[in-house]
Amino acid sequence: MIIVESNLDVADNSGARRVQCIKVLGGSKRRTASVGDVIVVSIKDAIPRGKVKKGDVHQAVVVRTAYPVRRADGSVIRFDRNAAVLINKQMEPIGTRIFGPVTRELRARKFMKIISLAPEVL
């Protein structure tokens, strides 16, 4: 469960390392984001010569959360840390590689490019 000011790891090679949520998209009263939701983030830590730099504002899709995600079959999946993948205005990832597992919930949200780049889908 991601709220405003939550810090997330970046699970791609766009050049960002850490981001901070500054807005949860999807309605004026929406307060929390879960796996598959799009958020607006500010880059807090980035590597030199990356595609993004510190202070940039981008959209990102949440791919892993520490808060448990309950599925229709009753199973629950959670991760050690929160992570996101930076995306552009066309909802395609900025990076060319995805690090770590992603969840099946992204398929229902039509993030097929992220699913295909991920090494493991849980």
From Swiss-Prot:
Q: Which SUPFAM superfamilies match?
A: Ribosomal protein L14 (SSF50193)
CDD domains, A to Z: Ribosomal_uL14
Which keywords appear in this protein's UniProt record, sorted alphabetically?
Answer: Ribonucleoprotein, Ribosomal protein, RNA-binding, rRNA-binding
What's in the GO CC field?
A: cytosolic large ribosomal subunit
Q: Which residues cross the membrane?
A: none
MF annotations from Gene Ontology: large ribosomal subunit rRNA binding; structural constituent of ribosome
Which Gene Ontology BP annotations are present?
translation
Task: Please state which protein family the record places this protein in.
Answer: Belongs to the universal ribosomal protein uL14 family.
Described by its record, this protein's role is as follows: Binds to 23S rRNA. Forms part of two intersubunit bridges in the 70S ribosome.
Instruction: Describe its partners and assembly state.
Output: Part of the 50S ribosomal subunit. Forms a cluster with proteins L3 and L19. In the 70S ribosome, L14 and L19 interact and together make contacts with the 16S rRNA in bridges B5 and B8.
Q: What is this protein called?
A: Large ribosomal subunit protein uL14
List the source organism: Acidiphilium cryptum (strain JF-5)
